[in-house]
Amino acid sequence: MGGASVLPMKDLVALFGRLGFAEARSYIQSGNVVFKGSRPQALSLAKRIPEELAMSHGFKTRMILLALEEMEEALSSNPFPEGEEDPKSLNIYFLAGNPSKPDMESLEQVKSSSERFSLLGKVFYLYAPDGVGRSKLAASVERRLGVEATARNLRTTLAALKIARDLL
């Protein structure tokens, strides 16, 4: 999930349960919910969850769904292994689709001298050793790529992956 509205994770997990995903799990107040289900079920859920939240909590949100294999592939393809030393310095942006016209030149212009980035398919990696919170690039990735995204630091991504593997 992405967006500025705050929703207690227990409420979000409960919503997954009401929609038939009793084994849903969350990781802190990250917007990440891990659940077990088929691809068709998950695709249906991607529409139903935002609709339910609009009705029950009065705000719009979006969901970006990832299969376990997609998370594993994103982690194994990490072009910045040095980010593993400080997992908060590496943000992984999971994109809603492949960018059709990413503005890589403007990304290059806005990045700081210490930042590095890479776009690999539907995943954008930002290594920001001076902190993602200070990054001008981090705040403009979606706009410059032209596609919706959700970003998680390496620590959160690894935690969500562990929860997903534990559900198997």
Language-model-derived ranges and their functions:
Residues 1-168:
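Surface-exposed, charge/polar-rich loops and edge strands
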